[in-house]
Design a protein with these regions (language model features):
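Generic beta-sheet signal
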Residues: 63-65, 141-145, 172, 217-225
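Short acidic, glycine/serine/threonine-rich loops at helix termini
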Residues: 77-79, 106, 156-158, 184-188, ...
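N-terminal capping segment at the start of a domain
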Residues: 14-31, 177-179
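A short alpha/beta connector and helix-capping loop motif
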Residues: 154-179, 222-223
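Glycine/aspartate-rich loop-and-adjacent alpha/beta segment that forms the canonical ThDP
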Residues: 199, 206, 215-264
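Active-site pocket-lining segment
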Residues: 170-188, 197-204
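Cofactor-binding active-site loop characterized by glycine-rich and histidine/acidic residues
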Residues: 28-29, 39-159, 165-166
């Protein structure tokens, strides 16, 4: 049926994205790349770009996708590639001198990149401004913003949530990639957030899993994910945050991903 076909299509996209991301990670050599937070978000990116309206024509009616946990560019760029906004040649320049595709994204609407990221928490406040402008123009498009759970340690996230509730920005949808890890280790050990669900609710946001009904308030999706999902030697390991792939480790990671999708 239609839903099963959609799931199969998304799984194929994720498979392609992960293999391409591993190629890109290998190409950085001793500089390394942010693998863990990208591989926890691959499914989020694949699903998001399958429903959002994005293009390279600067259309004011386009949806805005703001990546606040901006170090997950291996997922971001490969999603833009699957969407047709980037080509393989673009990806081959990843993090090299003169590239447009750095380890943190630089805003370039031609490539569908809406926001220059890097400083955690700023993406949500930027998204609030974009959503407010759309609201004042009576536009019906959406603003999607991706946060990390570790990123929710930032005070600016909670200031932004107050603004979202105050201005009743029902055109803004927050997705939290809750992989349980941040730079220095497990999020619960660094700064225990206890119940993110209750915190978001206290700011007047609606928690949901599917976007299938209208709402008068902003919504948040908390996605429980796995750091470096699918890569056996990096999963749920703080070393996955930013690491170097040797050729041997790259080959093992490819083997793991192929095994993960075997038969699908």
């Amino acid at each position: 049926n239609m839903i099963e076909n959609k799931i199969i299509s998304l799984e194929k996209d994720c498979y392609d994205m992960k293999l391409k991301a591993l190629e890109m990670a290998l190409s950085t050599g001793s500089n390394g790349s942010h693998i863990g937070g990208a591989f926890s978000a691959m499914e989020i990116f694949a699903a998001l770009y399958s429903v959002a309206y994005v293009d390279d024509t600067f259309d004011e009616k386009r949806d805005r996708i703001i990546i606040s946990k901006a170090h997950c560019v291996l997922a971001y760029y490969t999603a833009l590639w699957k969407k047709g906004l980037l080509c393989e040649k673009d990806l081959s320049t990843f993090d090299k001198n003169g590239t447009s595709f750095h380890g943190h994204p630089h805003r370039n609407l031609t490539y569908g990149i809406e926001f220059s990221g890097g400083s955690l928490g700023l993406g949500l406040s930027y998204a609030v401004g974009v959503a407010l402008a759309m609201q004042k123009k009576y536009q019906s498009n959406k603003v999607y913003v991706l946060l990390g759970d570790g990123e929710c340690d930032e005070g600016i996230v909670w200031e932004s949530l107050m603004s979202i509730a105050n201005f009743k920005l029902n055109n803004l949808i927050i997705i939290v990639d809750r992989n349980g890890y941040q730079l220095d280790g497990p999020t619960k050990e660094i700064m225990n957030q206890y119940s993110l669900e209750e915190k978001f609710k206290s700011f007047g946001l609606e928690l949901l899993c599917v976007l299938n009904k209208p709402s008068d308030v902003s919504r948040v999706i908390i996605a429980d994910t796995v750091k470096a999902n699918g890569i056996s030697f990096l999963m749920n390991n703080k070393m996955a945050h930013h690491c170097v792939l040797s050729l041997k480790k790259y080959e093992k990671a490819v083997e793991d991903i192929k095994a993960m999708y075997d038969g699908k």
